[in-house]
């Protein structure tokens, strides 16, 4: 274990050693299940919805903030599921987006671990304890549609969900899947010491898994991930998201494919794209065509809210529309969307992500590019 920690280029601290002995935050079987779900997304059989705290959010979230973040994500998911008529894989960057190491703070990794464990325990309780009941989630969406200035625009989708739920009730259908959900945690690997200390060898297969989160994310879109982060992601069995920006070249993307998905496994690799509304239609086609020609089947996700300059809502919508238009013109699958939530302000600021979900639902239901 100490040898693995030293590969990060740092001295091994007492906090690293403590984490190396700590229980995993997630389990290998859960990671494998997510890989199966992402493979379905890559094949065009599902969508991926990623959401979570903005970069720089503090490690610890209150129970109310966790609940409101999850509630917003579930509301978005219900709308997208109805609109696209496919399952929506829900991944939250809700337990593992923490600051880079600071000199003189050896206790930070341990505090990070405790905060993540607390958050994930709350998420598991909420997703199985009634908060995720589809009827309740739709009631929240109904409240949003009633209160929203754009409510009339969204009324058709809300009515359609009403009818679908009424039909299932009339048929006597009440599956357990309507009352609980699968929820997965994404972890930004800014801290290799933290992620390496929580890497475990699966007793079933002997493969290494990062147990700090089900899915690991590398890169920030503005700068490519460094060799150490790519090397770490290549060694583990977790699915990997690489964030790409407008300066990312086709050769760089093909390099990530070769390093991170040498076996060309559908869903092993996700590309989160922050290209900007003004450039997505120019840059995305070549990326998709060249990656597809390489034999890879990644999940393509649009990440419009972290494009440079804190884009306005109209720019976000235009980038999402461009993302869908490009994939439709190429005959490939627009795999999903990543959106930023706002920590303890989610309860107050959920209108924008919910507006986005209803507008994406319109794009998903529209048969023609640009409609």
Where are these regions (language model features)?
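Intrinsically disordered, low-complexity proline-rich regions
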Residues: 1, 13, 169, 290, ...
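N-terminal basic/disordered segments at the start of proteins
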Residues: 1-50, 54
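Short coil/turn connectors at secondary-structure junctions
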Residues: 43-46, 83-86, 266-267, 295-297, ...
């Amino acid at each position: 274990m100490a040898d693995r920690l030293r590969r990060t280029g740092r001295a091994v601290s007492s906090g690293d050693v403590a984490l190396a002995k700590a229980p995993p935050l997630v389990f290998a079987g859960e990671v494998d299940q997510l890989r199966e779900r992402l493979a379905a997304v890559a094949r065009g059989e599902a969508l991926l919805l990623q959401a979570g705290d903005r970069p720089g959010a503090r490690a610890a979230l209150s129970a109310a903030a966790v609940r409101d973040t999850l509630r917003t994500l579930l509301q978005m998911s219900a709308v997208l599921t109805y609109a696209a008529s496919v399952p929506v894989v829900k991944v939250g960057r809700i337990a593992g987006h923490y600051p880079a190491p600071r000199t003189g703070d050896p206790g930070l990794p341990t505090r990070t671990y405790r905060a993540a464990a607390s958050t994930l325990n709350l998420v598991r309780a909420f997703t199985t304890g009634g908060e995720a009941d589809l009827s309740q989630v739709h009631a929240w969406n109904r409240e949003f549609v009633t209160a929203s200035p754009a409510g009339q625009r969204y009324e058709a989708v809300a009515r359609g969900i009403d009818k679908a739920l009424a039909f299932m009730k009339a048929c006597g259908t009440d599956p357990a899947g309507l009352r609980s959900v699968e929820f997965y945690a994404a972890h930004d690997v800014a801290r290799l010491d933290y992620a390496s200390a929580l890497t475990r060898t699966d007793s079933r297969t002997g493969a290494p898994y990062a147990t700090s989160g089900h899915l690991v994310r590398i890169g920030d879109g503005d700068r490519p991930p460094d060799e150490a982060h790519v090397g770490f992601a290549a060694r583990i069995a977790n699915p990997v998201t690489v964030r790409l920006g407008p300066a990312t070249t086709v050769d760089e993307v093909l390099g990530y494919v070769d390093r991170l998905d040498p076996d060309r496994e559908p869903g092993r690799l996700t590309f989160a794209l922050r290209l900007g509304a003004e450039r997505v239609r120019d840059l995305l086609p070549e990326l998709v065509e060249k990656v597809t020609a390489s034999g890879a089947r990644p999940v393509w996700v649009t990440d419009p809210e972290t494009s440079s300059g804190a884009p306005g809502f109209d720019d976000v919508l235009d980038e999402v529309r461009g993302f869908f238009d490009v994939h439709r013109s190429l005959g490939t699958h627009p795999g999903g969307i990543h959106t930023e939530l706002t920590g303890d302000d989610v309860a107050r600021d959920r209108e924008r992500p919910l507006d986005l979900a209803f507008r994406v639902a319109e794009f998903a239901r529209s048969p023609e590019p640009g409609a």
